[in-house]
Amino acid sequence: MKTLGEFIIEKQAEYPEAKGELSGILSSIRLAAKIIHREINRAGLSQDILGVAGSENIQGEAQMKLDVFANETMKKALLAREEVAGFASEEDDNFVAFENDRAKNAKYILMTDPLDGSSNIDVNVSVGTIFSIYKRVSPIGSPVTMEDFLQEGRKQVASGYVTYGSSTMLVYTTGNGVNGFTYDPSLGLFILSHPDMKMPTEGKYYSINEGQYVTFPMGVKKFIKYCQESDEATKRPYSSRYIGSLVSDFHRNLLKGGIYIYPTSTVYPKGKLRLLYEGNPMAFLAEQAGGMATDGFNPILDIKPSELHQRVPFFVGSTSMVKQADKFMQECAE
């Protein structure tokens, strides 16, 4: 039995030049995940932490009370260790520069969707936390700048998510494979339960909000029809599974094989998901597990961000399924 802490130390020892900053950040995320896990498990017993907070994020979306709690928990956990120079969240209008001397000398910045799928909390459906870590590009010792956050996803040094469901799991990569750890609340420890995770090349699930079908581009409509057709050679029809929480849908497809799609639409002409907080971290995980992630045409990780809350169409999952979806998109664009 190997704990997350032991695994982090073991991996750090493989890099003699490492000074432990990244390990410290992962430990901060581990602590935040435990606190968020505890609060989510109390949600049904305390109305104080359920429902709408009465505020909106920069996207104009109503913030749930647990959105605000998870965001502040992540921020405080990172501030306590002073291993990151700056922090950006889907829930905040702008990035936060950590101004104390040690933080200003830190090498890394972190971006997060602190509680993905939070609208599901009231009905006891799985939610998650997504995170993404980069090396800063601004001079060490100075406050972070916008350029530190507007980096291509290919430059991530680590990304991951925590899924709060029937069990709580932390899944992450540092660019050398994907590993999953299940939380044992009786011990207060994350235990390595899913070493070297691989996404099946072929899948049998497609995850998309079909209630929005009439708003989708033709390429997506044709792919949905393809998924529903019978064909023994490709083991179709595929099964439709859509939870409404990116982390939950992605996690199932990582284990079982499948594709998750949130495309452009007449309602969201640029897509709905955020490139920096959702697209890049999940795309990095997918590629590290042998999967694929695109915007329907090009790899997500190659997109150069132009703004902090940039939206993106998102196709992620088993390689064969993403390639097939991209093929329909490209044919309909010609």
From Swiss-Prot:
Its cofactor is Mg(2+). GO terms for molecular function: fructose 1,6-bisphosphate 1-phosphatase activity; magnesium ion binding. Transmembrane segments: none annotated. Substrate binds at residues 116-119, 209, 242, 272. Keywords: Carbohydrate metabolism, Cytoplasm, Hydrolase, Magnesium, Metal-binding. Mg(2+) 2 binds at residues 113, 116, 278. Mg(2+) 1 binds at residues 90, 113, 115. Pathway: Carbohydrate biosynthesis; gluconeogenesis. InterPro entries: FBPase_C_dom, FBPase_class-1, FBPase_N, FBPtase, Fructose_bisphosphatase_AS. One of its GO terms (biological process) is gluconeogenesis. It is found in: Cytoplasm. Binds 2 magnesium ions per subunit. Belongs to the FBPase class 1 family. This is Fructose-1,6-bisphosphatase class 1. The gene is fbp.
